[in-house]
């Protein structure tokens, strides 16, 4: 349930997380997001997360993968860079199975996580990378839905159903944030962000977001914002919660605009 530490996120809050480039900026100073997303089972996640990242105003997207996934990403976004190099933030796990040894290709995707673990830049963990929550030294944001959060908590000997989490997202997001020392963005019809004892509540999401792939798009948007805000986040880790909420807010607003367009087309 909501308490005195919970506040509602607004468009003005989101605007404060948008870094506007200056005449002195270049592609590196505008933020570089390293992506380890997509797999043989879910190749679309690689394309969706990278494209969303680039559409959100990052200076560069570095996609890390085998040649097959890289070709798919480059076909949709030729400006993406598919060589390892310096990054200002990481996004990992979208479209990757959480069971590392489920098959050989998934194992290979998990091996890329070593790159991320060796650095100290802000990191976003989604889907198959959630098990790393609490194991990294850098500022970390996790973006689970209720089912993924239930599985993560079970790995820490806390038994709770996804239905219970959905019924009280604020409590469970807070508990997870405090347990693991990370920022938690718990996805749902009412998305919440928890950091320590602070909670940010997002406006109710449009049901048009209840489709496959929207989580990958959200991850890309948030990853881009984290990459562009990396200096602010390293100076003040509390900024990570604001940036995460801004990503969810932008994601929902984009979906609302897109759904209005579809409604007009059907008339």
What are the roles of these predicted feature ranges?
Residues 1-124, 131-141, 146, 151-267:
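Small-residue (G/A/S/T)-rich helix-start motifs and N-terminal tracts that mark the onset
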């Amino acid at each position: 349930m909501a308490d005195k530490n919970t506040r509602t996120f607004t468009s003005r809050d989101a605007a404060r997380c948008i870094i506007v480039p200056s005449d002195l900026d270049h592609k590196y100073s505008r933020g570089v997001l390293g992506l380890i997303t997509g797999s043989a089972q879910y190749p679309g996640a690689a394309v969706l997360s990278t494209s969303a990242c680039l559409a959100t105003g990052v200076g560069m997207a570095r996609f890390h993968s085998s040649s097959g996934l890289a070709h798919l990403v480059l076909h949709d976004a030729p400006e993406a860079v598919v060589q390892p190099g310096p990054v200002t933030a990481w996004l990992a796990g979208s479209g990757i199975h959480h069971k590392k040894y489920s098959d050989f290709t998934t194992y290979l995707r998990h091996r890329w996580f070593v790159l991320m673990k060796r650095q100290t830049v802000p990191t976003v963990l989604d889907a198959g990378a959630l098990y790393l929550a609490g194991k990294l030294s850098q500022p970390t944001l996790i973006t689970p839905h209720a089912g993924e959060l239930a599985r993560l908590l079970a790995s820490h000997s806390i038994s709770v159903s996804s239905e219970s989490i959905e019924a009280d997202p604020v409590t469970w997001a807070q508990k997870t944030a405090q347990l693991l020392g990370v920022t938690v963005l718990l996805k749902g019809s009412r998305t919440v962000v928890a950091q320590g004892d602070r909670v940010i509540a997002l406006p109710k999401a449009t049901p048009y977001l209840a489709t496959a792939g929207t989580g990958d798009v959200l991850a890309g948007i948030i990853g881009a914002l984290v990459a562009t805000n990396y200096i602010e986040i390293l100076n003040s880790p509390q900024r990570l919660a604001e940036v995460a909420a801004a990503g969810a807010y932008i994601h929902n607003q984009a979906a609302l605009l897109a759904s209005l367009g579809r409604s007009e087309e059907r008339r």
